[in-house]
Amino acid sequence: MNNNEILVSLDIGTSAIKVIIGEMVNDSLNIIGVGNVKSKGIRKGAVVDIDDTVYSIKKAIEQAERMVGLDIRSVIVGIAANHAILHPCNGVVAVSSENREITSEDVIRVKDAAQVMSIPPDREIVNVIAKQFIVDGFDEINDPRGMLGVRLEMEGIIVTGSRTFLHNTLRCVERAGLEINEIVLQPLASGEIALSMDEKNLGTVLVDIGGGSTTISYFRDGYIQQTSVLPVGGDHITKDLSIGLRTSTEEAEGIKVKHGHAFYDLASEEEVFSVPVIGSDQHDQFNQLEISEIIEARLEELFMMVVEELRQSGIHDIPGGFVLTGGSSAMNGILDLAQDVFQNRVRVAIPDYIGVREPQFTTAVGLIKYAYKNARLTGRKLSESNQAAPVAKEVRKERPDVKQETKPARKEQPHDGEEKGVKGRMKRLFGYFFEE
């Protein structure tokens, strides 16, 4: 781990909070640590209880730290697409160096120039996506660094989000004792792992089925064109099963994962299991076919909502088909049901990395890949703060019985250039979030 970059992602979801520790070796990602805990304080992707959310973040961080003996101090944070809006942008700068060679500094300046636009006071910039760079009129350039020119332009997309939504999410991360290296819109991260470049160019819909919500993202011409969030996810299936089987939500979740099938026509009547009845000592017998009827009804409703959302957005031609990801996309039969509803090609995206080969980790892994790619373009390093430190930590062992203000831990030793490069940048973006 000596000279390689260690990056940590934090994916805050409704049903689970995931932490991935990745080691970048010659631009290749190795997963060396994973934290995955049930989340509290999140509903439909938004923070509803700061103390519960902070506690869940700390537990996930601890779990990942124990795997590798690493002291996690900074993270790449995924921001849900709730209330996200995409705006076209354009920036132009003169190349600053005397020899007219374009550097990372010029790329930063042209990105900053592209952000000079009128944004409502209740919104904040989350990401700036470069569609193409133009050097002295020559377009379709992905990376202009090292080229010679006088005039550098960038055409791109600015992603803005609700200032309040961002405030609450980032405040939880800060109160968990973590610094924020980078923030990334979750669909951008998911697309980095789930979609091939051909799929992004053709026109493909990425459907990320989370616990409390489902994110729909449309990619075409190499970049994201549209994103929206539906307030339905895997937790709704669990609640449906809980009601239908008259059992607890915990039991219903276990049954969904172990015996669930999304396509009624292919479900088995022979797969029988016992279900404890809530409030009594009795057990009822059910088979997979019976619960499949419940699951299929909810997922079919969700997929029809996806179709309607795309129709209202004016998206009709989808030559790249549909790609499913997120925890609920691992269910048996979901491909058959999706193909039946969408009448198009459908596949499930799974991260191809040891230890995280499940669709629920797509966003968390994608956060590292996306942030690393962007940091390279601007010459930034993201990993200065995380260090090997196998020291027992007391700060996150017990949850206090009484809710109280949690002071950020482990900030007493600032690193060289940290205020300027990382936290300073975040302060400029989200000034009033970090008031002392």
Predicted regions and their residues:
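Nucleotide/phosphate-binding catalytic cleft detector across ATP-hydrolyzing
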Residues: M1-A16, I20-V75, I79-T204, T247-E250, ...
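Residue-level signature of catalytic and energy-coupling elements of molecular machines
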Residues: S9-L10, V19, V77, V173, ...
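A short acidic Gly-Thr/Ser loop motif
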Residues: L10-A16, I79-A80, L206-S213, F219-G222, ...
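Glycine-rich phosphate-binding loops at beta-strand->alpha-helix junctions
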Residues: A16, A80, G161, F263, ...
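Short, surface-exposed connector motifs at secondary-structure boundaries
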Residues: L152-E153, R220-Y223, G314-G321
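A conserved active-site cap/scaffold subdomain adjacent to cofactor or substrate pockets
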Residues: P231-S248
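ATP-binding/phosphotransfer module of carbohydrate and carboxylate kinases, centering on a glycine-rich
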Residues: E308-G320, M331-V346
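Glycine-rich phosphate-binding/hydrolytic loop that grips phosphoryl groups
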Residues: R347, P351-A392
